[in-house]
Regions:
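N-terminal single-pass transmembrane signal-anchor helix
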Residues: 1-25
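Membrane-proximal amphipathic alpha-helices
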Residues: 22-34, 49
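Short, conserved structural patches
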Residues: 38, 42-188
């Protein structure tokens, strides 16, 4: 009788323990993604824009010099995943890999969330309604960064139950731009 009970309970216990471990792993991955996104958007608000049409979309109107800029979320400059517009490759490499050379040392997104690629990131700049026409530091925009991944795979439970994993939720982090410059003075 004891052997029969053991044969029934043992697989259930292994499954329950595996589920707890893999759920913890899933939460760990979500936390890594959230931290990477926080770092990424923070870097974007103090760096040169990565979208190719930023200067065209947010060009100042010289006839309205000194006038306040209206908030208009429909005025956007977007690049990255799902947009069909490629972000600046050098800036994206720097954002993902970081810059650990010279006097500038900061980690990239991959240091916090290994496996992240430029193809999973979407970056959106939109008018925030702050600032004025002709502002020396450029327009004040809202910077939004999103990451999209397919699913989180469960190594043990996924194979046992033949599941495809749990969909990774889209992470969106938003911040208001500061100076949108990567270096002091003119960048070369």
């Amino acid at each position: 009788v004891a052997l029969t009970e053991g044969l029934i309970v043992f697989p259930i216990m292994v499954l329950a323990i595996s589920l707890c471990v893999e759920f913890g792993y899933m939460m760990y991955q979500w936390n890594l993604a959230a931290k990477a996104m926080q770092l990424g958007v923070r870097k974007l608000v103090v760096s040169e824009p990565v979208t190719p049409d930023f200067n065209t979309v947010f060009a100042f109107d010289d006839t309205q010099s000194g006038q306040l800029i209206d908030a208009d979320a429909s005025v956007q400059s977007t690049c990255g995943a799902g947009t069909g517009i490629a972000c600046d490759a050098a800036m994206m490499t720097r954002l993902i890999s970081g810059n650990l050379t010279g006097g500038q040392r900061w980690p990239g997104l991959a240091n916090y969330f290994p496996g992240i690629t430029a193809g999973q990131i979407r970056i959106i700049y939109e008018l925030s309604g702050l600032g004025y026409q002709g502002r020396p530091g450029g327009p004040v925009v809202t910077v939004r960064m999103e990451i999209g991944r397919d699913a989180i795979d469960f190594p043990v439970i996924g194979r046992l139950l033949e599941s495809i994993g749990i969909a990774f939720p889209p992470f969106t982090v938003t911040a208001t731009s500061e100076d949108l410059r990567s270096c002091p003075g003119p960048c070369s």
